[in-house]
Amino acid sequence: MISCINNVAWDDFKVMPSLAHNLGLKAYLYVSIFDEGFPLFPKKIREVSYHNKMHHQHFTRQSDFSRKYPDYNVVDRNNEHRQWGVLCLAYPEVRDYFLKRFLRFLNDGDFDGLFICFRSQSRPADFADQYGFNKPIQQDYLAKYGCNIYEQDFNLQTWRDLLGEYLTTFLFELRESLKPLSLRLSVGTARGDIVGPPLGNTTLNWRKWVKHRLIDELVINQNSSQCPSVWHQLWPMHRGYGYLQNYIDGYNMEPVLEHISSTYTPIIIKNKTVDLFVARQWNKRSKTEEAKLLSHPTVKGLVFSSFRHDNPGPIARGDWRV
């Protein structure tokens, strides 16, 4: 497979933007920040704990950076377990790694913007507040609140908010880096005020992003527990517990239209600088539901999976392999 890839005579970074522009469309570079991959676990573990049986049980991938610097992956309070593939944004080195990589990719093609997906394919946390105890976080929390999260009881919500601040800091730094290039910035998240499964209760301070125009488009309703292409359930044996909001079982979540009206509309309408889109890759097509969403005054548009549209055969058999 690798040899075939190396023999491809065209560059998708060049071709895709050109095709999009010829059709009057904009081309965004799609990247992720919580999906650096994980090592291949022992076979005994893989027999009962895996991403999905079709293609990700006895195979894995991992970025060179996360493999070279394992301590940058988020860690639990006892410094015993890491959530592989989820790098800690409290480290300036991690933020710099993403910034340089994204800018390098953007320079390789005629893109109109950058889309950051907050989905993760890493093994879910066993409980929502399991990870987020790397040394810089401990130091910042101690400096800010006078409490050592390694040794003392601490306020969970202020800790969750601190984790969210690192995400906002990264978006601010990224926004500043994109300004000279005149590129737009979009983010895709779960609905609600936390990052959610499979990551944790990290505060998702999207209101601040909108108010200060750190982003141009906000895509909500993303889902990490299900493949957006073939709809396999991912890590179905590891759902975790303790989430303040949970899109998997609907805990503390309003129906999407009500949620948009009660929570997103006041912020989006007031600021009038950010467009709101609703992800529909994980929903069956419904003209009625889609029409209702599109008629909502706050919703700019819907997001679909081109894979499901272009590949009826693999969708029907539930397997995209030839």
Can you annotate each of these PLM segments?
Residues 1-5, 118-137, 229-237, 247:
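Glycine-rich, proline-tolerant flexible connector loops at the mouths of alpha/beta enzymes
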Residues 1-32, 155-178, 235-242, 248, ...:
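Aromatic-lined substrate-binding rim segments of carbohydrate-active enzymes
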Residues 18, 29, 34-104, 108:
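Active-site-adjacent "subsite" loops/lids of carbohydrate-active enzymes
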Residues 20, 98, 105, 114, ...:
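Conserved, mostly hydrophobic/aromatic
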Residues 25-38, 115-122, 158-202, 272-285:
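Aromatic-lined carbohydrate-recognition surfaces of secreted/lumenal glycan-active proteins
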Residues 36-45, 91, 108-157:
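Active-site-proximal loop/short-helix segments
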Residues 85-90, 145-165, 192-195:
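Surface-exposed cleft-lining segments at the edges of enzyme active sites
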Residues 206-210, 214-233, 237-322:
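Substrate-binding cleft of secreted/luminal carbohydrate-active enzymes
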